[in-house]
Curated annotation (Swiss-Prot):
GO CC, alphabetical: small ribosomal subunit
InterPro entries noted in UniProt: Ribosomal_uS7, Ribosomal_uS7_bac/org-type, Ribosomal_uS7_CS, Ribosomal_uS7_dom, Ribosomal_uS7_dom_sf
Family to which the UniProt record says this protein belongs: Belongs to the universal ribosomal protein uS7 family.
Single GO MF annotation: rRNA binding
Subunit structure: Part of the 30S ribosomal subunit. Contacts proteins S9 and S11.
Function comment: One of the primary rRNA binding proteins, it binds directly to 16S rRNA where it nucleates assembly of the head domain of the 30S subunit. Is located at the subunit interface close to the decoding center, probably blocks exit of the E-site tRNA.
Designated name of the protein: Small ribosomal subunit protein uS7
Coiled coil: none
Superkingdom of the source species: Bacteria
Keyword flag Disulfide bond: no
The entry's keywords: Ribonucleoprotein, Ribosomal protein, RNA-binding, rRNA-binding, tRNA-binding
Length: 156
């Protein structure tokens, strides 16, 4: 571990349309090659499609989807006496959100719809209802942690 001072967390400005920090963070996750305007168009387009498809508030759907995709525990490799063990550890709250957002984006990319906006809208709606790729990924991670519960005494 470095002995220098801790680097302060950057303040993320809320997005212009909803004034929500999590939406702004999600845009940064969706963004590729620094094209923020494209990411903004994708996310806002997905939110509009959520409104037309389900008639629900897109922010509500987004936060529900995010909560359903957040992992509580994950496994980390720990080397003990020449053997690697998958040790279950609790996930920090900031990492929970980051992982959930990443999984939502990745699951949306793998979907079959035409545009990324449509894929994202579909994935968010699915995740809000407790299904979809991101929720499946979370269940998989939880299953791994449950299977390796015996090694939890090797905590970090």
């Amino acid at each position: 571990m470095p002995r220098r001072r801790e680097v302060p967390k950057r303040e993320i400005l809320p997005d212009p349309k909803f004034g929500n920090q999590e939406v702004s963070k999600f845009m940064n996750v969706v963004m590729s090659s620094g094209k923020k305007s494209v990411a903004e168009r994708i996310v806002y387009g997905a939110f509009e499609q959520i409104t037309t498809k389900s008639g629900k508030d897109p922010l509500e759907v987004f936060s529900t989807a995010l909560n359903n995709a957040r992992p509580l525990v994950e496994v980390k490799s720990r080397r003990v006496g020449g053997a690697n063990y998958q040790v279950p550890v609790e996930v920090r709250s900031s990492r929970r959100t980051a992982l959930a957002m990443r999984w939502l984006k990745d699951a949306a990319r793998k979907r079959g719809e035409k545009s990324m906006g449509a894929r994202l809208a579909g994935e968010l709606l699915d995740a809000a209802e407790g299904r979809g790729g991101a929720v499946k990924k979370r269940e998989e991670v939880h299953r791994m942690a449950e299977a390796n519960k015996a090694f939890s005494h090797f905590r970090f």
